[in-house]
């Protein structure tokens, strides 16, 4: 997998890895890594697993290092700068795949906090995956309302982010009309999902399969409705044309 350098905010370099799908309308996904000051990088095993879970389902996928990590330029900014990095990465991904049929974002721990802020700013994001969202450490109240449906997943042996905190966050978001938040707990998993990566990818993969099938069905229904509307418009045009060309009754008296 070749190294990729993309342009970030203020001309800074961002180190990334990219999986490209040849189909012009392939869906896209952006994956954000855990806290840089606690060893988080784009090569984190959970980030890597999410990246390949998306790729296995036909997504074009991008993961990258936040500023100051690896070969990405800059220094840790506590959130605003990292959000700008993520926005630049999504911009790049959308330039490469302008015809993508849908857009997803995923994050791990600190990366979920950045991912969800980006979700609020980018209405084109259709779904999300949040792994161990640290709602006990960061304020997620900006998700009011949450604009997209998605999955939150954590381990029940997580000593960094208690499962109850993720459950509370998920429950709050479920109150939004038209938004469905799924919450899954992986038994025995800690914050880093050590020895539980397969369980994690099985849950995420099943969720993506469900959403992909559902979204495809909804797109087909929309196409069918639009086809019917166009047929109705065509019938109306034909009726109007027939009225215009209909012969006028002869009113001359012989």
Predicted regions and their residues:
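Serine-hydrolase catalytic machinery in alpha/beta-hydrolase-like enzymes
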Residues: 7-97
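Catalytic histidine-centered segment of alpha/beta-hydrolase-like enzymes
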Residues: 74, 189-201
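Primarily recognizes the serine-hydrolase "nucleophile elbow" in alpha/beta-hydrolase
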Residues: 84-147
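Short beta-strand/loop motif that positions the catalytic acidic residue
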Residues: 146-154, 158
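Short alpha-helix in the alpha/beta-hydrolase fold that links the catalytic acid
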Residues: 148, 162-172
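Acidic catalytic loop of the alpha/beta-hydrolase fold
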Residues: 156-161, 191-192
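Catalytic histidine neighborhood in serine/cysteine hydrolases
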Residues: 173-192
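Catalytic active-site module of serine/aspartate enzymes centered on a nucleophile-bearing elbow/loop
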Residues: 197-254
């Amino acid at each position: 997998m070749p190294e990729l350098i993309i342009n970030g905010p203020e001309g800074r370099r961002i180190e990334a890895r990219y999986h490209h799908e040849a189909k012009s309308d392939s869906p896209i996904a952006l994956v954000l890594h855990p806290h840089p000051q606690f060893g988080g990088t784009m090569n984190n095993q959970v980030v890597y697993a999410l990246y390949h879970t998306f790729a296995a389902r036909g997504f074009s996928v991008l993961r990258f290092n936040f500023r100051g990590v690896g070969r990405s330029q800059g220094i840790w900014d506590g959130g605003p700068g990292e959000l700008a990095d993520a926005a630049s990465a999504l911009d790049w991904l959308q330039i490469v795949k302008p015809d993508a049929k849908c857009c997803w974002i995923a994050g791990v721990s600190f990366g979920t906090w950045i991912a969800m802020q980006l979700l609020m700013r980018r209405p084109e994001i259709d779904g999300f995956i949040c792994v161990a969202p640290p709602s006990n450490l960061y304020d997620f109240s900006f998700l009011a309302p949450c604009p997209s449906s998605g999955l939150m997943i954590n381990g029940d042996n997580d000593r960094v982010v208690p499962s109850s905190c993720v459950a509370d966050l998920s429950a709050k978001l479920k109150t939004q009309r038209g938004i469905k938040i799924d919450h899954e707990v992986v038994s025995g998993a800690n914050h880093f999902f050590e020895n539980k990566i397969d369980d994690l990818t099985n849950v995420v993969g099943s969720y993506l399969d469900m959403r992909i099938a559902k979204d495809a069905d909804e797109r087909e229904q929309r196409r069918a409705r639009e086809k019917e509307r166009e047929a109705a418009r065509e019938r109306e045009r034909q009726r109007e044309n027939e009225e215009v060309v209909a012969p006028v009754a002869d009113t001359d008296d012989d």
